[in-house]
UniProtKB/Swiss-Prot annotation:
Organism: Klebsiella pneumoniae subsp. pneumoniae (strain ATCC 700721 / MGH 78578)
Membrane-crossing residue ranges in chain numbering: 8-28, 35-55, 75-95, 105-125, 127-147, 159-179, 203-223, 235-255, 271-291, 297-317, 326-346, 374-394, 408-430, 455-475
Membrane topology: Multi-pass membrane protein
Protein name: NADH-quinone oxidoreductase subunit N
GO MF annotation terms: NADH dehydrogenase (ubiquinone) activity; NADH:ubiquinone reductase (non-electrogenic) activity; quinone binding
Family per record: Belongs to the complex I subunit 2 family.
């Protein structure tokens, strides 16, 4: 097969991040220099982001049987690159105090970003599996990066074992789907499934196993047990990546899979997904009520956010608006999570043992870091879905899609879940304004707003507010990001 210049341009983000991985590897082999490797990584990710403009000029195409580059792939590639950039930015001050090798951190983030970009354009079950593994394997190392702390090491072992089990379920499910249909490409699967094959037990078993594997990666109930422990044990910058890039990339590819394969037409699959969404929304919110650790709280809340997204996925067959709802919701979730985890990262930098993740560490923060407290408040309000924030626009879309598809019981779950969520998000926000304790145990640096991480957090807060009041630019971008059918 000959590769044309157009195909090379379409693959630019993938090639640039791949090249950055090689350059950073050689740089580490040549001389360990934390600043140099961090700069190379950030430059590579920025170059990949800029290259999306050229990809857009190039038009949509199938580059190989495995990868399809279209507006949809570009949107999710952009979101993954933004999350990876923020992760590297938050990691730099955190790693400054880290005693062991610092440079490999960036290498692992870049490899995981490579997996995310591959997933955004995946058009084949082989690409889906490769992408998921490329994201998961570096995360085993990243979650346990602070391995001298028992909690980080424990989180890494839990995540590794459960992730391996989930991958085997996913692979076995794919094998059963292949045995039944004789195809692995999304489009070919869609064609063969359209011929009333959705009642075959072997195919339903394969889809069931794939839902188990993907449910683990997306931390949906009942495959969520690793989530709070891993979010708490992982370093704050890694939790940022886990909550944003990996979830966005995997949900993006699941959405494409469901779009091409009319799986939603099967009543059995719809009921199973509906029950998973309902359980994730209610359980995630109820468990977050009693948490006193911010990272654990955000872990449980991420379970409920993916439950909300699942409502749009189930409604996918009933209209175009579901794609739009998911795009807007994920963008809002990305910026809100970057801000919230960014504040935790700033409070925990440089590395001094455990992160500043207990709710008590944030009590009275307003009285000596007013702007940082305002940012955290905006993020909590956005995650809760309060009007005038981007989180509200996303939640409104999900509710509209649910109503349009007549999923009344799931719409009720979203409303009840949001009401419960309001309590624990406001609990975090209110604690920032209480009287400060006599002795501060953790605090952000006094010049935090001039650091790269501080700038990322401030930009996230600004985007959440501006796009919450005037969401049209974001909605226009998401509407352009249509998958090639």
């Amino acid at each position: 097969m000959t590769i044309t210049p157009q195909q090379l341009i379409a693959l630019l983000p993938l090639l640039i991040v791949g090249l950055t991985v090689v350059v950073v590897m050689l740089s580490i082999a040549w001389r360990r220099n934390h600043f140099l490797n961090a700069t190379l990584s950030v430059l590579g990710l920025n170059a990949a982001l800029v290259s999306l403009w050229f990809v857009g000029q190039n038009g949509a195409m199938d580059v190989t049987p495995l990868i399809r580059v279209d507006g949809y792939a570009m949107l999710y590639t952009g979101l993954v690159l933004l999350a990876s950039l923020a992760t590297c930015t938050f990691a730099y001050p955190w790693l400054e105090g880290y005693k062991d090798n610092k440079e490999e951190f960036y290498l692992l983030v870049l490899i995981a970003a490579l997996g995310g970009i591959l997933l955004a354009g995946a058009n084949h079950l082989a690409a889906l599996f490769l992408g998921i593994e490329l994201i998961s394997l570096p995360l085993f190392g990243l979650v346990g990066y602070a391995f001298r702390q028992k909690r980080s090491l424990e989180a890494s072992i839990k995540y590794t074992i459960l992730s391996a089990a989930a991958s085997s379920f996913l692979l076995f499910g794919m094998a059963l789907v292949y045995a039944n249909s004789g195809n692995l490409s999304f489009l070919a699967l869609g064609k063969s499934l359209a011929d009333n094959m959705l009642h075959e037990p072997l195919l339903l078993a394969g889809l069931g196993l794939m839902i188990v594997g993907l449910g683990f990666k997306l931390s949906l109930v009942p495959f969520h047990l690793w989530t709070p422990d891993v979010y708490q044990g992982a370093p704050a910058p890694v939790s940022t990546f886990l909550a944003t890039a990996s979830k966005i990339a995997i949900f993006g590819v699941v959405m494409r899979l469901f779009l091409y394969m009319p799986v939603g037409n099967s009543e059995a699959v719809r009921v199973v997904l509906g029950l998973i969404a309902f359980a994730s929304i209610i359980f995630g919110n109820l468990m977050a009520l009693s948490q006193t650790n911010i990272k654990r709280l955000l872990g449980y809340s991420s379970i409920s956010h993916l439950g909300y997204l699942l409502v749009a996925l189930i409604a996918l067959q009933s209209g175009e608006m579901s794609m739009e709802a998911v795009g807007v919701y994920l963008a809002g979730y990305l910026f809100s999570s970057l801000g919230a985890f960014g504040v935790v990262s700033l409070m925990s930098s440089p590395y001094r043992g455990p992160d500043a993740d207990s709710l008590f560490s944030y009590r009275g923060l307003f009285w000596h870091r007013p702007i940082l407290s305002a940012v955290m408040t905006v993020m909590m309000l956005s995650l809760a879905g309060i009007p005038m924030t981007l989180g509200f626009i996303g939640k409104f879309y999900v509710l509209a899609v649910g109503v349009h598809a007549h999923l009344w019981w799931l719409v009720a779950a979203v409303v009840v879940g949001s009401a419960i969520g309001l309590y624990y998000y406001l609990r975090v926000a209110v604690s920032l304004y209480l009287s400060a304790p006599e002795q501060l145990n953790r605090d952000a640096p006094s010049n935090w707003q001039y650091s790269a991480g501080g700038i990322v957090v401030l930009i996230s807060a600004l985007l959440v507010l501006v796009l919450g009041i005037w969401p049209q630019p974001l909605i226009s971008i998401v509407q352009l990001a249509t998958p090639l059918m």
